Each structure stands twice: as structure tokens, then as C-alpha cells.
């Protein structure tokens, strides 16, 4: 703290101090050959020390055992269903980190400077979507933008004066070298993130790295100038209002709000063959016209009426992981709450192995609700006759090719009465089912693409009985999207591709007009 005060005194010209997420580095281990061995951007294992363990015992009233962190060698990564002791440790660390960080922020303010945090590598204890974060008193948060999901990681943060996104590419030699193409990377990054910005804008944009490297790429500088101008117009038109949301969607997993937009990430926007089919759901939602929230099973146990203002619940991931819940489905309160929600008219979308956990004669614990089950070998003795496909369904109406399910799922079969939309080699990849007054959709996987984003959009509308509102603030071409800012009296149409596009655009009153768009173009209109 003394060094911080000294720095402030010796640098009066500095008016913003940007902290690199304060104290604890995420879990990162290397092997004897200096290769990365283990990485977990959300890991807490690097925050353990004798002092911390002593303080934990005093506050919580029980000893912290090594196994609470080691966790059979899985180190409680975010795919593991968190136990009580690990969640206690996380909450303890958040309180401890918040107290220390507040001291630093208070000193910063006393010295007449703003305090900004770079949300990233030292994020332990400073997760912005928990209540402790607001007590720190930060003025701003900045973070790296890799895609729409990581943009929403930043823009959805509450309790700060402004948020900022650091866009790619970084001004490093791996991109800015002879023969490099920084413009291509910049375009991909901006167009990908723009979808999310149009739903929840950050307040500022920027880049990082060695500035002098960019001087040798004048075409890059010109493109960045165009991005800045586009962002200014976007921000001016969208600020101060929530864009039109057609439905309210909740992503249900073991983490809930604390992992908002970050679920299915091992590291920041890092591709994994095993999870891209699930991460695509979150990426699609980041720029879709829905009011999205993230809820946990603990939230349901605390308040089973939490779903009262929700239209559709999504449970996505592999069985027995934190993303689908694992053994939590043995708790009758959880399964009853979801069944009641759907039976009374709610929508449910299960992706991968939703509610997957072998228990009481089922692998998918909501198999009766979803109308689909996984063949684990225990039911091979039962014949299965429901394999007919129903391709002329509302959900598939805009598809132009066979649906890309990514890795898909093997050994999924449908119960009688379930309507199969897609099965391949007698393995169900997509199906719909009625349950009481409600509806469910099963999808084996859905990597992010514009066409798959449209499939998810229609799935949400169908499961929520929302077919009638399809042609409101809507583009018939799935490569083009419409966002309406009704309070501000404006709406925009955006081409997400690098090619010209034609589409029919529907306004909020279902009137329409034809439109031709240049690559990447965004057009603004008065309502």
C-alpha cells in the first residue's frame, strides 16, 4: 500500500491506474520440458497458502483439506460439479480479495485518480458477477475481446462507470510482420464482437501492444479508423436503453451467474474439440435478441419460483459435469421444479446430455420431459421403433443444408410420441416433445454459425410458443440480423458476413421492406 501511495505521488500526470485483476494468478502449470501442462482460467488452486488456510479455518469453522482443491487430480476445474467446501473457499477468497482490492482502490481515489481493472489472468476473487465485486469500488473494467461471449463477459458487468474492450489483433510481431495480415484478423474480431455489442454495448474500445508495429500497416490503421467511427455511431444510437428482446432465456448450470458468458471456456475463447458444440450455444446467445440470464441449481433450491419470469431454460453440456448438473438431479426439488415449469407452459432446450446422470433407471434425468434418452447399454433389450424424421418443422424452416451438430451425440434414441427432426444412422440429433402445456427441444450439439444461430433462435421461439412473433424485428436471411432500440426510436440491420446480402426486413409491426447490403455493412433507421 505504501508503494502504491508512493507511485501516485511520483506520477501526478497519471489519472487512471489500471490494475491487472489484482492478486492471484489463474492455475497454470508446466512440465519438466517447460511445456504447458495444465491450464484453468477459472482455477483457484494457485491461491492457496498457509496464511489463507489459517484464515479460512477461523472464518468457516472447519479445516480446509488439500483434497478440496486437488479434487482427485481435476483441481475443481469448471467442468467439475463444485462441492460445498470448494464453494465455501471461493466465497472466502472473494471476500478476502475484495477487502484488499478496496484498500487499493480507496488509495487510488484519495490520490485523485480513477481505478480500472483488467479482467483476466488474475481474476481469482474478483469475478464481476458476484456481489462482492461491487464493494471494491472500481471505476471501470477493461478486458480482451475474443468473440461475442468474451465481449459480454465485459459489457454485462454492473457497478462501474464504464467498460472497455481490448480488440484483436494485439500489436505483436506474430501478426505485425512482413507478410502478416492484421486487417483480416481485425475484421474477423470486430464483426464477431459486433453482434454482442449491439445487444449490450461496452463504453469504449481499444487495442494493445507495441504501437510502433502498426505504423508499417497503413491499411490496418484505416480499418481501425472505420471501426471507431462505426462504434461511435452504434454507441450513440444504442446507449441508455435495452434493445428489443423477444423472450427471456435462462442458462441453467452449477455455476449460474458467476460464470455468466464464461461457461464452456477452459481458457479465454480457446477452441476445444470437446466443447465447441456447446460453446456455440453461448456464442449465439451473446448476440441474439433475448434477455439472457444464468442461473444455478442452488438458485432453484433457494427459490423454486425463480423461473416465474423466464420463458425458456437451456441446459447444455455433457452428463455428470457442472454444466448439466450431475448428481444434483437426484434432488427431487430440482427435477420437480423444472418439470413444473415446463408442464405449466415453459420451454426447455437440452443440448448434448442435458440432466445427464445415471440414476433410478435413467441417464437423462428429464428423459420423460425431453422425450429422448441415451442408450448406455442398460436398455439394449428394449426395441426402439421411433425413427421417422419430420423435417418440415418450424425450427428447420430456414436451413439451407444438413444441420451441423458439431461432434453430435451417439446412442440417443426417442420415446414414442417424440417428434424427431434429425436422426443419423438411428441416432437422434434433434427432436421436439410436448410436456403438459410446455415444449422441449433436444439438440445434440450446435457449433456457432449464422445458420445454427437461426436454428437456436427458432428453437427458443417454438419452445416458448412464440411462433407468432417471428416476423417482428426480423431478417429472412440468417446472415443478416435486426436490432431494435425502441426507447431511442431506432433500429439497425447488420450484415454479419464478408459478402453482399439480400434480405427481407420485418419491422416491429410486421411490415417489411427489401434490402441489399454490402459486406459487413450496418444500416440505421428511425422507427
Regions found by a protein language model. Give the residues of each.
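A short, well-structured beta->alpha microelement
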Residues: 117-126, 282-305
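Extracellular ligand-binding/catalytic regions of CAZymes and related secreted enzymes
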Residues: 28-31, 38, 212-246, 286, ...
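A short helix->loop->beta-strand "cap" motif at the edges of active sites that frequently abuts
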Residues: 112-113, 161, 344-347, 438
Amino acid at each position: 500500500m505504501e508503494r502504491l501511495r508512493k507511485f501516485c505521488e511520483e506520477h501526478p500526470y497519471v489519472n487512471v491506474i489500471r490494475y491487472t485483476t489484482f492478486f492471484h494468478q489463474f492455475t497454470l502449470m508446466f512440465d519438466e520440458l517447460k511445456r504447458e501442462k495444465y491450464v484453468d482460467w477459472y482455477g483457484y488452486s494457485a491461491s492457496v497458502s498457509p496464511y489463507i488456510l489459517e484464515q479460512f479455518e477461523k472464518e468457516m469453522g472447519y479445516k480446509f483439506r488439500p483434497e478440496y482443491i486437488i479434487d482427485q487430480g481435476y483441481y475443481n476445474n469448471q467442468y467439475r460439479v463444485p462441492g460445498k467446501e470448494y464453494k465455501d473457499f471461493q466465497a472466502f477468497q472473494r471476500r478476502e480479495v475484495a477487502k484488499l482490492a478496496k484498500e487499493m482502490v480507496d488509495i487510488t481515489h484519495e490520490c485523485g485518480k480513477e481505478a480500472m481493472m483488467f479482467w483476466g489472468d488474475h481474476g481469482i476473487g474478483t469475478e464481476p458477477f458476484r456481489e462482492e465485486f461491487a464493494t471494491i469500488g472500481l471505476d471501470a473494467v477493461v478486458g480482451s475481446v475474443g468473440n461475442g461471449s468474451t465481449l459480454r463477459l465485459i459489457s454485462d458487468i454492473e457497478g462501474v462507470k464504464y467498460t472497455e474492450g481490448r480488440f484483436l489483433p494485439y500489436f505483436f510481431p506474430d501478426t505485425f510482420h512482413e507478410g502478416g495480415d492484421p486487417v483480416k484478423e481485425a475484421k474477423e474480431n470486430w464483426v464477431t464482437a459486433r453482434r454482442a455489442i449491439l445487444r449490450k454495448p461496452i463504453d469504449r474500445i481499444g487495442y494493445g501492444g507495441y504501437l510502433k508495429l502498426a505504423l508499417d500497416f497503413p491499411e490496418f490503421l484505416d480499418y481501425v479508423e472505420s471501426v471507431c467511427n462505426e462504434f461511435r455511431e452504434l454507441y450513440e444510437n444504442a446507449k441508455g436503453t435495452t434493445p428489443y428482446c423477444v423472450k427471456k432465456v435462462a442458462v441453467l448450470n452449477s455455476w449460474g451467474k458467476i460464470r455468466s458468458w464464461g461457461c464452456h471456456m477452459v481458457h479465454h475463447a480457446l477452441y476445444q474439440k470437446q466443447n465447441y458444440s456447446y460453446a456455440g450455444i453461448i456464442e449465439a446467445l451473446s448476440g441474439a435478441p433475448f434477455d439472457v440470464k444464468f442461473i444455478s441449481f442452488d438458485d432453484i433450491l433457494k427459490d423454486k419460483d425463480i423461473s416465474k419470469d423466464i420463458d425458456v431454460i437451456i441446459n447444455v453440456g455433457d452428463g455428470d459435469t457442472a454444466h448439466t448438473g450431475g448428481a444434483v438431479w437426484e434432488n427431487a426439488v430440482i427435477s420437480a421444479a423444472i418439470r413444473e415449469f415446463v408442464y405449466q407452459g415453459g420451454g426447455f432446450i437440452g443440448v448434448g446430455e442435458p440432466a445427464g446422470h445415471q440414476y433410478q433407471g435413467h441417464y437423462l434425468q428429464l428423459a420423460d420431459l425431453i422425450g429422448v434418452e441415451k442408450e448406455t447399454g442398460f436398455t439394449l433389450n428394449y426395441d426402439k421403433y421411433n425413427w421417422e424424421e419430420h423435417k418440415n418443422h418450424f425450427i428447420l424452416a430456414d436451413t439451407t443444408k444438413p444441420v451441423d451438430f458439431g461432434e453430435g451425440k451417439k446412442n440417443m434414441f426417442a420415446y414414442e410420441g417424440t417428434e424427431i427432426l434429425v436422426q443419423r444412422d438411428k441416432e437422434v440429433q434433434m427432436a421436439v416433445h410436448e410436456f403438459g402445456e410446455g415444449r422441449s427441444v433436444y439438440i445434440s450439439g450446435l457449433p456457432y454459425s449464422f445458420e445454427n444461430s437461426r436454428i437456436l433462435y427458432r428453437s427458443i421461439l417454438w419452445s416458448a410458443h412464440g411462433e407468432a412473433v417471428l416476423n417482428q424485428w426480423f431478417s429472412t436471411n440468417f446472415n443478416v440480423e435486426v436490432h431494435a432500440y425502441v426507447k431511442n426510436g431506432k433500429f439497425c440491420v447488420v450484415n454479419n458476413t464478408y459478402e453482399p446480402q439480400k434480405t427481407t426486413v420485418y419491422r416491429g409491426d410486421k411490415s417489411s421492406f427489401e434490402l441489399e447490403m454490402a459486406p459487413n455493412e450496418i444500416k440505421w433507421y428511425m422507427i
